[in-house]
Amino acid sequence: MRNLPIGVFDSGVGGLTVARAILDLLPHEPLYYVADTAHFPYGTKSIAEVRQYGLAVLDRMVADGVKLLVIACNSASSALLRDARERYDVPVVEVIQPAVRKAVSATRNGKVGVIGTPATIASMAYDDAFAAAPHVDLTTAACPRFVEFVEAGITMSDELLECAKEYLAPIVERGCDTLILGCTHYPFLAGAIALVVGDEVMLVSSADETARDVYRVLVSRGLTRPASAPPPVHRFAATGDPEPFSRLGRRFLGPEIGHVTTL
């Protein structure tokens, strides 16, 4: 069990931000990353659709063998986390609570913004997560096209900046000093987002906090791979055409991505 990989799941390349954080924190651990590109994007689909597609992929990953699952997708975390934790014997880590914890501790004026896909914002998953911090003044905003820009390999352009100004207007007007990037694709757009909201606003990505959660769970359950073990072998797969994911993945993650298989 200790030598099985950590499973990381997303609809596309966004979860690679989480994968990178896990690789940096746990370099001895192998990863099994699956992108459900056949059903991308999740952010514009209904909760029922995301649950159906996501659980089908997670079923396959568990059958293939993983010691822990990371749902590295905010839309999927909000739609199927409870089902996944009831369905599988392996621990399941998600990305919403880690980001909320970090934002609550980071805000200075108590005004926190959350941006995400339409599905994530409509689910009110972040509203529910912040219920335990009633002193926080929360502002949420959907950013429908951000994921499309990332999946097209665009991280800075005039069109992107115009979209960002429109989407982020409620955050700026409210005076939020902390902004949760509530989609794992969004850290790739951090430069454009910072240009709009200003350098004084702290951008919170769930990636590093999620990696720490993975570490804590592995240690508490005795699932860490021995440091003396051979170098890990990572596996990457896509449910759709693997070529676009492979091309973008190498750009965003680096040489760790080798051959991408079709799931």
From Swiss-Prot:
Pathway assigned in UniProt: Cell wall biogenesis; peptidoglycan biosynthesis
Name recorded for this polypeptide: Glutamate racemase
GO MF annotation: an example: glutamate racemase activity
Sites where the protein binds substrate: 10-11, 42-43, 74-75, 184-185
Role noted for this protein: Provides the (R)-glutamate required for cell wall biosynthesis.
Record family assignment: Belongs to the aspartate/glutamate racemases family.
Taxonomic classification: Bacteria, Bacillati, Actinomycetota, Actinomycetes, Acidothermales
UniProt-listed GO biological process terms: cell wall organization; peptidoglycan biosynthetic process; regulation of cell shape
InterPro entries noted in UniProt: Asp/Glu/hydantoin_racemase, Asp/Glu_race, Asp/Glu_racemase_AS_1, Asp/Glu_racemase_AS_2, Glu_race
Coiled-coil annotated residue ranges, if any: none
